[in-house]
Swiss-Prot record:
Gene: hemB
Subunit structure: Homooctamer.
UniProt-recorded name of the protein: Delta-aminolevulinic acid dehydratase
Chain positions recorded as 5-aminolevulinate 2 binding sites: 277, 316
Function: Catalyzes an early step in the biosynthesis of tetrapyrroles. Binds two molecules of 5-aminolevulinate per subunit, each at a distinct site, and catalyzes their condensation to form porphobilinogen.
Reaction(s) this enzyme catalyzes, per UniProt: 2 5-aminolevulinate = porphobilinogen + 2 H2O + H(+)
Source organism per UniProt: Synechocystis sp. (strain ATCC 27184 / PCC 6803 / Kazusa)
A biological process term (GO) from this entry: heme biosynthetic process
Length: 327
């Protein structure tokens, strides 16, 4: 006890502090999200997400090269199609925007890992993540018919060269359905990163501007999780593990670090944390107003995800963080 035990002894110098640091953020932890749109030479900034852009495929390739040069190992692609319909055709069509972006990136930067978001909300004309009953205005997605769309989408993305399939729609049984579809088409070696614990969160607002994916009516609470629940997250993860998930994700991250920790304690699989758009935009807005030190707050936040148990971090801060970590 004091005065014999003095924890401050190990905090006296920067070198000592670094030697005993329990969790260290590295560029290898980072995954950078990108939004692909039709056209050429397009780089349209998302108003609610300073520094984030909707990009045409040629610009996506430029970004992918920069990401690679910064040492970031992976990107995750989201698509914004020109046309939307009830069948989410743009999600699974071989000439879909994400398929084109995937092919272009893998050709130009073959060593960069391309993760593809496997969801339907950006591609449906109602903004929900699957088929709806005729006349439904509440957002109650028909689960099992939607699985058929997700299977087609995953196979199409794999055909385009995706390295990792990341289903995010929170449909019951979606991991098993996608795993079986991939295996049936000789894609046994493509891993699945499941959005296993995805909450119905208010932090997604800016993303829906970026991805043009806001529901036209109702909400997503019948398929995304209640923010008040934690045991349910463990159940979702357990089911996804049984269905064949190779990695699992918690989304959002900042307000759900207890969930990251609990999931990390229950599984040996890699756990990803999605530092979502609202979390990003709050930091950006405060920094632009001079209220916080953007670099310090960002690196502290990302390190906290590591401390909570995240092995991978999807973040719009990835490029900035990579530069800061090099300094």
């Amino acid at each position: 006890m004091f005065p014999t035990i003095r924890p401050r002894r190990l905090r006296q110098t920067d070198v000592l502090r670094r030697m005993v640091r329990e969790n260290t953020l590295t560029v290898n932890d980072l995954i950078y999200p990108l939004f692909a749109v039709p056209g050429n030479a397009i780089a349209k900034e998302v108003v609610s997400m300073p520094g984030v852009y909707q990009l045409s495929v040629d610009k996506i390739v430029d970004e992918a090269k920069e990401v690679r040069d910064l040492g970031i190992p992976a990107i995750i692609l989201f698509g914004i199609p020109e046309d939307k319909d009830t069948d989410a055709t743009g999600a699974w069509h071989d000439c879909g925007i994400v398929q084109k972006a995937t092919e272009a990136v893998k050709k130009a930067v073959p060593d960069l890992v391309v993760i593809v978001d496997t969801c339907l909300c950006e591609y449906t004309n109602h903004g929900h993540c699957g088929y709806l009953e005729t006349g439904d205005l509440t957002g109650r997605v028909l689960n099992d018919p939607t699985l058929e769309l997700l299977k087609k989408t995953a196979v199409s993305q794999a055909n385009a060269g995706a390295d990792v399939i990341a289903p995010s729609g929170m449909m019951d049984g979606f991991v098993q359905a996608i795993r079986e579809a991939l295996d049936d088409h000789d894609f046994q070696n493509i891993p699945i990163l499941s959005y296993a614990a995805k909450y119905a969160s208010a932090y997604y607002g800016p993303f829906r501007d970026a991805a043009d994916s806001s529901p036209q009516f109702g909400d997503r609470r019948t398929y995304q999780m209640d923010p008040g629940n934690s045991r349910e997250a463990l159940k979702e993860v357990e089911l996804d593990l049984l269905e064949g998930a190779d990695m699992v994700m918690v989304k959002p991250a900042l307000s759900y670090m207890d969930i990251i920790w609990r999931i990390k304690e229950m599984t040996n699989l890699p756990v990803a944390a999605y530092n979502v758009s609202g979390e990003y935009s709050m930091v950006k807005a405060a920094a632009l107003n001079g209220w916080i030190d953007e670099q310090k707050v960002t690196l502290e936040t990302l390190t906290s995800f590591k401390r909570a148990g995240a092995d991978l971090i999807l973040t719009y801060h990835a490029k900035d963080a990579a530069r800061w970590l090099q300094d």
